[in-house]
Swiss-Prot record:
Biological process annotations from GO: detection of mechanical stimulus involved in sensory perception of sound; pexophagy; programmed cell death in response to reactive oxygen species; regulation of peroxisome organization; response to reactive oxygen species; sensory perception of sound; stereocilium maintenance
UniProt name for this protein: Pejvakin
Any Pfam family: Gasdermin
Function: Peroxisome-associated protein required to protect auditory hair cells against noise-induced damage. Acts by regulating noise-induced peroxisome proliferation in auditory hair cells and neurons, and promoting autophagic degradation of damaged peroxisomes (pexophagy). Noise overexposure increases reactive oxygen species (ROS) levels, causing oxidative damage to auditory hair cells and resulting in hearing loss. PJVK acts as a ROS sensor that recruits the autophagy machinery to trigger pexophagy of peroxisomes damaged by oxidative stress.
Classification lineage: Eukaryota, Metazoa, Chordata, Craniata, Vertebrata
Cellular component, GO annotation: ciliary rootlet; cortical actin cytoskeleton; cytoplasm; neuronal cell body; peroxisomal membrane; stereocilium base
Length: 352
């Protein structure tokens, strides 16, 4: 039920996708600024990540006893009161049924009321923290570091901002039939079917947070990944297997680069090919021969070997051409190699 309310809050507030809803009321106090959380991908087919709280802060995994001097600023964000009637049919309804924990038999909708009141935002002074961590090192003997380092799927993150309530808040849910009066009155002892539910939680409860990933180097230095492009994790030692995979990756990259070069050189050829045969009903071969000045010849008959076409550049094995023109000269040669159709005609059309 608490998870359903925090998910709805994050969805409505937005913040560019950086905000993460607090999944459980019992763990809300563990998502404070400078706290550490573990980020894991749920599975290969599920794009979203799962954040797990830890009992540690950034200071706990650093060498030395010096406190982190980066301050935390806070300000009022908004006044949040939400009442919504959600259908049980559909994607959002399926998610809410799993979160609210009430009996929905015979119901087609759920009325949800969340009263958070004024919420405040507490965030770490990023510039101050970035200056400070340049002289700090990670303690690799810390249990959290050892366990995270052994897992390739886990990424350590530091909480950079949290959103909290300022007063006692209430959440209430009622399952019913759309069209009925969806009133919020809750008497648990007189509600044996469990179709209504309400909770009250104290002030200063964290309902959402955002994180920066940590990238940790082999020497203990670390970086804060302040943009979504940067990815956290641990720098890996270069082993024999790692070196082999690195070389294999470079070989595949070089091969793909060569393929892309061939494609880029042949793009002009392909564009004109489709243009000629799909946009123009008349063959350009007939047009070029009407000029009478440039004639397509077989270069093999003149002791000139086959080779790549001067226009499209495609000249490997079966794509090499034996045709060309003696009236054109390129690169000091008194002939050019051109594919019979359509390169020969495209070349001469562009020379006009």
């Amino acid at each position: 039920m608490f998870a359903a309310a925090t998910k709805s809050f994050v969805k409505q507030v937005g913040d560019g996708g950086r905000l993460v809803p607090v999944p459980s009321l019992s763990e809300a106090d563990k998502y404070q600024p400078l706290s550490l959380v573990v980020k894991k991908k749920r599975c290969f087919l599920f794009p979203r990540y799962k954040f797990t709280s830890t009992p540690f802060t950034l200071k706990d995994i650093l060498l030395g006893d010096r406190e982190i001097s980066a301050g935390i600023s806070s300000y009022q964000l908004l006044n949040y009161e939400d009442e919504s009637d959600v259908s049980l049919y559909g994607r959002r309804g399926n998610h809410i049924v799993n979160d609210v924990g009430i009996n929905v038999a015979g119901s087609d909708s759920i009325a949800v009321k969340a009263s958070f009141g004024i919420v405040t935002k507490h965030e770490v002074e990023v510039s101050t923290l970035l200056k400070e961590i340049t002289t700090r090192k990670i303690n690799f003997d810390h249990s959290l570091i050892r366990q995270s380092r052994s897992s390739r799927k886990a990424v350590l993150c530091v909480v950079m901002e949290s959103i909290r309530t300022t007063r006692q808040c209430s959440l209430s849910v009622h399952a019913g039939i759309r069209g009925e009066a969806m009133r919020f009155h809750f008497m648990d002892e007189q509600n044996p079917k469990g179709r209504d539910k309400a909770i009250v939680f104290p002030a200063h409860t964290t309902i959402a947070f955002s994180v920066f990933e940590l990238f940790i180097y082999l020497d203990g230095a670390f970086d804060l990944c302040v943009t979504s492009v940067s990815k956290g994790g641990f720098e890996r030692e270069e082993t024999a297997t790692f070196a082999l995979l690195y070389r294999l990756r470079n070989i595949l990259f070089e091969r793909n680069r060569r393929v892309m070069d061939v494609i880029s050189r042949s793009q002009l050829y392909l564009d004109d090919l489709f243009s000629d045969y799909y946009d123009k009903p008349l063959s350009m071969t007939d047009i070029s021969l009407k000029e009478g000045t440039h004639i397509r010849v077989n270069l093999l008959n003149h002791n000139i070997p086959k080779g790549p076409c001067i226009l499209c550049g495609m000249g490997n094995f079966k794509r090499e051409t034996v045709y060309g023109c003696f009236q054109c000269s390129v690169d000091g040669q008194k002939y050019v190699r051109l594919h019979a159709v359509p390169c020969f005609d495209i070349w001469h059309k562009r020379m006009k």
